UniProtKB/Swiss-Prot annotation:
Binding-site residues, Mg(2+): E260
Classification of source organism: Bacteria, Pseudomonadati, Pseudomonadota, Alphaproteobacteria, Hyphomicrobiales
Listed PROSITE patterns: AA_TRNA_LIGASE_II (PS50862)
Compartment(s) of residence: Cytoplasm
Keywords for the protein's UniProt record, in alphabetical order: Aminoacyl-tRNA synthetase, ATP-binding, Cytoplasm, Ligase, Magnesium, Metal-binding, Nucleotide-binding, Protein biosynthesis
Any single Gene Ontology cellular-component annotation: cytoplasm
Subunit comment: Tetramer of two alpha and two beta subunits.
Catalytic activity: tRNA(Phe) + L-phenylalanine + ATP = L-phenylalanyl-tRNA(Phe) + AMP + diphosphate + H(+)
NCBIfam families: pheS (TIGR00468)
Protein name as catalogued: Phenylalanine--tRNA ligase alpha subunit
Required cofactor(s): Mg(2+)
Length: 360
């Protein structure tokens, strides 16, 4: 048995001397592998008589167990040492500033800023936010909004359609956030007062149009809602958003399938060489469309038009952002140009509030 004891002592010494996991694995293979020294001893047991096999087998198994335990313990030590070395090499000095100088700090995108400004203004008037899916059905996007069959907006050149289903119906990318109004009227009972911001999609691309753009719509449904309420809300919104004490507005008759009467809204402005100033001047600029919700839309959403009436409006978030902050090309909003963002962006922690100033 002295040979077995010597072998065990040598293997344990090799384990203790292993400097890394690769060296330790080599020791394991040399001892316990298919052709290892202890494995070779176990293979000789079959040639022994029963009494000798019992004695020798127990001794060899004790040696194997001792080697296995030593391997496990040494592996744990080596793993802990490797982790400590890695952590030491990757030490972060938490007293150092997290960012580079202010010129290289990230900036909040103007669309995110304007989105927050809209939310602050309408929240102050008691509106909540309603959201819905970008992928819509024809029923929610057109039919329930009083778009007749054959309306140009239903054509492929204006709307992104998915491939038809087996029943012939097709999903589409919503062309406006009005389907959110439909979903709200179907799921809530009046009074309703919501704004519906989100992404919308139309097959169009030029200096003032992109295939994907952002829109915000507002909806009020109640028993006594009328155009006077609508005009007041829009007037207060324009004063707050453009940060002027007063602004003249012009309401022109128009047509939208989902409102009756329908109106387009212009605001007074002065056009300069590099900017547009609101609340003064002799020019007019269209900013949004609005109107009283069409009785057919109320009926399609399960509301009695003899009991309830309401009004709605919609505007492009991208467009009003360009008007307020002097951006000339809509496509630049989506080009991810860091130089452009550093010029037009906002500090991330400057949260817009009516009390503190929207864009201060």
């Amino acid at each position: 048995m002295s040979n077995l004891e010597n072998l065990q002592s040598q293997i344990l010494a090799d384990i203790a001397a292993a400097a890394d996991e690769a060296a330790l694995e080599a020791v394991r293979v040399g001892a316990l592998g298919k052709k290892g020294s202890i494995s070779a001893l176990l293979a000789t047991l079959g040639k022994m008589d029963p009494e000798q096999r019992k004695t020798e087998g127990a001794a060899i198994n004790r040696a194997k167990e001792a080697v296995t335990d030593a391997l496990t313990a040494r592996r744990d030590v080596l793993k802990a040492a490797a982790l400590d070395a890695k952590l030491a090499a990757e030490t972060i000095d938490v007293t150092l500033p997290m960012r580079e100088p202010a010129a290289e700090q990230g900036r909040l995108h103007p669309l995110s800023q304007v989105w927050d400004e809209l939310t602050a203004i309408f929240a102050d008037m008691g509106f909540s936010i309603a959201e819905g899916p970008d992928i819509e059905t024809d029923d929610y996007n057109f039919t329930k909004l009083n778009f007749p069959e054959g309306h140009p907006a239903r054509e492929m050149h204006d709307t992104f359609y998915f491939n038809p289903k087996e029943d012939g119906s097709r999903l589409l990318l919503r062309t406006h956030t009005s389907p959110v109004q439909v979903r709200t009227m179907l799921s809530q009972r009046p009074p309703i007062r919501v704004i519906c911001p989100g992404r919308t999609y139309r097959s169009d691309s030029d200096q003032t149009h992109t295939p994907m753009f952002h829109q915000v719509e507002g909806l009020v449904i109640d028993k006594g809602s009328h155009l006077g309420h609508l005009k007041w809300i829009l007037h207060e919104f324009c004063k707050a958003f453009f940060e002027v004490d007063n602004v003249n507005m012009r309401f022109r008759p128009s047509f939208f399938p989902f409102t009756e009467p329908s109106l387009e809204v212009d605001i007074q402005c002065r056009r300069g060489k590099d900017e547009i100033r609101f609340g003064e001047g002799e020019d007019w600029l269209e900013i949004l469309g609005c109107g009283m919700v069409h009785p057919n839309v109320l009926t399609a959403c399960g509301l009695d038009p003899d009991e309830y009436q309401g009004f709605a409006w919609g505007m492009g978030i991208d467009r009003i952002a360009m008007l307020k902050y002097g951006m000339s090309d809509l496509r630049q909003l989506f080009e991810a140009d860091v130089r452009w963002l550093n010029h037009y962006g906002f500090k991330p922690l400057d949260i817009p509030t009516l009390a503190g100033g929207l864009s201060s």
